From Swiss-Prot:
Source organism of this protein record: Mus musculus
Cystine pairings recorded for this chain: 305-390, 346-374, 348-357, 430-452, 443-449, 461-481, 468-498, 493-503, 563-615, 615-625, 619-631, 633-642
Coiled coil feature spans: none
Compositional bias ranges of the Pro residues kind: 733-748
Gene name as annotated: Adam8
Main location: membrane
Signal peptide: 1-16
Name of the protein this chain belongs to: Disintegrin and metalloproteinase domain-containing protein 8
The protein's assembly and partners: Interacts with FST3.
Glycosylated residues in this chain: 89, 260, 431, 614
Length: 826
């Protein structure tokens, strides 16, 4: 706090002393100060470039000092990120950049709960940060990160008042909008959703290139835009990852000032040139062309994961946050969101004066920053559709540009969880500093994770949405719900047959395209075909319900061409696929055309085309076949063939997992017992080993007589006679030795010359084999010269009669005294 106070005292920024900015009404000049910070725990090595993993800046304004804590958005660029541009000779170049560094950061403002920041640091600081309901923008006045910067609120930004070109009548896939806010929420609304991902491909046209002046400037602009869009969608558990960028200095299709024409041309170009060439989920055009009227963007509704997944965006603001807000809005349409104004009773917690919500129809001087509750309900309804599977494809997190980083909300190599930065993390199961589970936790996220524990097997984690969907159950081992599965193709459903998780019918397709009052046209309409341009009609003589889709009633869609003609039984309407009528909407694949038949490749074919007959027979009446022709077991039964109950499988798994533990326990007990037994044996043998080392060994020949060895004998210790200075045991009977032919040396005068009587054992000593006498005469024994301070050697005892045993240990200068050996019974 003292540091911040000092900064506020030292910094007294002047108001608008710099050069005038044509796009800003008023601003303050600030000098950001980069704060010293310790290197991130998992910061990348220096070869990754000049932009560190985390940064902190202090921004002093009139009356406030804001401290921004930023972390590099390492997930901004996907592993397959490419850039395509035109070379000087006109040839097209595509580069897949490796170890691509960038300067895009996200973060928060210290001391402000719920704050957010999206900043570029390439040439000074450029971006925004939000404190409460106020959005602050910052841009450099020179290229120094600590030089002069213009800082202003969003309300002071001068820009074109923009609107979205999407009209309510174009919300074909969403049905009627009236009172939708009161409709029942999806059944799985309360089930936590896992993170979904939009792999984004961006195209910048020639007008945008000319406007910004260089390829690098366009690239930096696009990265700033996507970085901001990603930040906005994190609120909805979505991540936006840029996988491709094209920069044109010459347009590849006609870009009209009419947004709808440009959108149709753009999507046609995508289908012909981009689809299948570079994997992506959504494509966005950023154009420098000024669209007619107030329109700044247009998109297809509920089109993500389809061939219509895309939008066009006019770069209408000097600040990149402007076009980013437009792109976030149009991407919302692709994700099934409608305008907040089109839903009666829709509530946005942010007032319009403060920017409103992202899906408001018009963009004012303040940029929106949150989604309304209506948008969240629309999104939840859209993602439950089976055709949105592309959103669940997790990008290869181990190949993100920049490598794994703790705190980016992606669980990467070496991490058990990732709940964001320590300031943002609200997950009690995850340590945000280490990205490891807290002690005692089994999981931190996932629909099969509850209070840090994996849910038991058999609990529902994803409800079925309709007759063509299947509910999924937790397996008791993983915190994530199994892959979304649905009924096998050809399963009967209301009015038709299931196909890829949906139940396509002619009636539903007419309502989707022409509104709730539409219905299927008479059969006579389906006996005609329409040539391109709706120039007449051709009678085929037979009914074909698998060609062009003919409807009647409903509302005529705006900005869509259509063809109308009369038949014997009514009016036939055919809807064009775009603003022209060269092609028409066709009946969808899998639509029921006759009893037991479906549309496939433009013709009415038997259900056997699905090759799914008798598939469920292998599921033992406890499950059905899914779209992968695998058994999807009923609740309580275990895959793969639904023969065993989950409880039995769990018991077997528990037994199999406990078997190694029991084996280890038994081994530990056995080892412990062996150690104890070995200890007892060693303990009992220890005195004997000491005694053996203390007494003379049993002689095997006359040469073993200890008197024949000098003190420097090289015999091993266990065969060497006892040293006179060693302690000799008195607890064992004397062992017989060979009787020497010469008398022992005379003892010192202090000791009596008459030997002490030696007791005889009462029991008979066992027969012992006497060693043979030496074959050669023994050498003359010379007595050793002993210093007065040492005791003389003990005289030997006759074998077989028992004898004296040397006394206890003698001290220096103390004579040895023969002791009586205690009588022991054998």
């Amino acid at each position: 706090m003292l540091g911040l106070w000092l900064l506020s005292v030292l910094w007294t920024p002047a108001v608008a002393p710099g050069p005038p900015l044509p796009h800003v009404k008023q601003y303050e000049v600030v000098w950001p100060r980069r704060l010293a910070a310790s290197r991130s725990r998992r910061a990348l090595p220096s070869h990754w470039g000049q932009y560190p993993e985390s940064l902190s800046y202090a921004l002093g304004t009139s009356g406030h000092v804001f401290t921004l804590h930023l972390r590099k958005n390492r997930d901004l660029l996907g592993s397959s990120y490419t850039e395509t541009y035109s070379a000087a000779n006109g040839s097209e170049v595509t580069e897949q950049l490796q170890e691509q560094d960038h300067c895009l950061y996200q973060g928060h403002v210290e001391g402000y709960e719920g704050s957010a920041a999206s900043i570029s640091t390439c040439a000074g600081l450029r971006g925004f940060f939000r404190v409460g309901s106020t959005v602050h923008l910052i841009e450099p006045l020179d290229a120094d990160e600590e030089g002069q910067h213009a800082m202003y609120q969003a309300k002071h930004l001068q820009q074109k008042a923009g609107t979205c070109g999407v009209k309510d009548t174009n919300l074909n896939d969403l049905g009627p909008r009236a009172l939708e806010i009161y409709r029942a929420q999806p059944r799985n609304w309360l089930i936590p959703r896992e993170t979904r991902y939009v792999e984004l491909y961006v195209v910048a046209d020639s007008q945008e290139f000319q406007k910004l002046g260089s390829r690098e400037a366009v690239r930096q602009r696009v990265l700033e835009v996507v970085n901001h869009v990603d930040k906005l969608y994190q609120e909805l558990s979505f991540r936006v990852v840029l996988v491709g960028l094209e920069i044109w200095n010459k347009d590849k299709f006609y870009i009209s000032r009419y947004a709808n024409v440009t959108l149709e041309n753009f999507l046609s170009w995508r289908e012909q040139n981009l689809q299948g060439q570079h994997p992506h989920d959504n494509v966005q055009l950023i154009t420098g062309v000024d669209f007619i009227g107030s329109t700044v963007g247009l998109a297809k509704v509920s089109a993500l994961c389809s061939r219509h997944s895309g939008a066009v965006n006019q770069d209408h603001s000097k600040n990149s946050i402007g076009v980013a807000s437009t792109m976030a809005h149009e991407l919302g349409h692709n994700l099934g969101m409608s305008h907040d104004e089109d839903i009666p009773g829709c509530y946005c917690p942010e007032p319009r004066e403060g920017g409103g919500c992202i899906m408001t129809e018009s963009i004012g001087s303040k940029f929106p920053r949150i989604f309304s509750r209506c948008s969240k309900i629309d999104l939840e309804s859209f993602v439950t559709k089976p055709q949105t599977g592309c959103l669940t494809n997790v990008p290869d997190v181990n190949r993100f540009v920049g490598g794994p980083v703790c705190g980016n909300l992606f669980v990467e190599h070496g991490e058990q969880c990732d709940c964001g930065t320590p300031q943002d993390c609200q997950n009690p199961c995850c340590n945000a500093t280490t990205c490891q589970l807290v002690k005692g936790a089994e999981c931190a996220s996932g629909t099969c994770c509850h209070e840090c524990k994996v849910k038991p097997a058999g609990e529902v984690c994803r409800l079925s949405k309709d007759k063509c969907d299947l509910e999924e159950f937790c397996d008791g081992r993983k915190p994530t719900c199994p892959e979304d599965a649905f009924q096998q193709n050809g399963t009967p459903c209301p009015g038709g047959y299931c196909f890829d998780g949906s139940c396509p019918t002619l009636a539903q397709q007419c309502r989707d395209l022409w509104g709730p009052g539409a219905r299927v046209a008479a059969d006579s309409c389906y006996t005609f075909s329409i040539p391109p341009g709706c120039n007449g009609r051709m009678y085929s003589g037979r009914i074909n319900r698998c060609g062009a889709l003919y409807c009647e009633g409903g509302q005529k869609p705006l900005e869509r061409s259509f063809c109308t003609f009369s038949s014997n039984h009514g009016v036939c309407h055919a809807l064009g696929t775009g603003s022209n009528i060269d092609t028409f909407e066709l009946v969808l694949q899998g639509t029921k055309c006759e009893e037991g038949k479906v549309c496939m490749d433009g013709s009415c074919q038997d259900l056997r085309v699905y090759r799914s007959e008798n598939c469920s027979a292998k599921c033992n009446n406890h499950g059905v076949c899914n779209h992968k022709r695998e058994c999807h077991c009923h609740k309580g039964w275990a895959p793969p063939n639904c023969v065993q109950r989950l409880a039995d499988v769990s018991d077997e798994q528990a037994a199999s997992t406990s078997l190694p533990v029991s084996v280890v326990v038994v081994l530990v007990i056995l080892v412990a017992a062996m150690v104890i037994v070995a200890g007892i044996v060693i303990y009992r043998k220890a005195p004997r080993q000491i005694q053996r080392r203390s007494v003379a060994p049993k002689p095997i020949s006359g040469l073993s007589n200890p008197l024949f060895y000098t003190r420097d004998s090289s015999l091993p210790a266990k065969n060497r006679p006892p040293d006179p200075s060693e302690t000799v045991s008195t607890n064992q009977p004397p062992r017989p030795i060979v009787k020497p032919k010469r008398p022992p040396p005379a003892p010192p005068g202090a000791v009596s010359s008459s030997p002490l009587p030696v007791p005889v054992y009462a029991p008979k000593i066992p027969n012992q084999f006497r060693p043979d006498p030496p074959t050669k005469p023994l050498p003359e024994l010379k007595p050793k010269q002993v210093k007065p301070t040492f005791a003389p050697p003990t005289p030997p005892v006759k074998p077989g009669t028992g004898g004296t045993v040397p006394g206890a240990t003698q001290g220096a200068g103390e004579p040895k005294v023969a002791l009586k050996v205690p009588i022991q019974k054998r």
